[in-house]
Amino acid sequence: MKKSYESPVYKVKAVPLEKVQANSYNPNKVAPPEMKLLYLSIKEDGYTQPVVCYYKEDKDVYEIVDGFHRYLIMKNYKDIYDRENGMLPVSVIDRSLGERIASTIRHNRARGSHDVDLMSNIVAELSELGKSDAWISKHLGMSADEILRLKQITGLAALFKDEEFSMSWE
């Protein structure tokens, strides 16, 4: 009998805050008023969504894929840390670096704002990992024009190696 798929959310676990770390590629920013609202939400309702992480077995740490700001609330507010006994609800996914970057962007696209420089660096990193523009478009929900603009920001000619020459570039 074929085993059915089980979403990671059904395996949420309590992880010590000290074992959770930020990733280096999240371009999502939350303004101070929204952070205060997130604090109030967690204070009043508790954690209603787990922080999505990738487990780095070699370092015994959980790297955040989604939920960085929920993590920051526990890290920066002693009352929340104490109430939760320093334990953060975590849902673990096992994906490659490129897939984790894409997942972070997908989780963030509908909320917050994105730092354009960080987004262009992410597109550059994915390109350097061998991801095609079509892959980036599909997995990050970006148009070809948006990818092109973000590549232009980095100014790295290597990112255009798969592009055909256009007279408009002259």
Locations of the language-model features?
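Alpha-helical interaction elements
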Residues: 85, 110-170
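Short, charged/polar surface micro-motifs in flexible loops or helix N-caps
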Residues: 70-71, 96-98
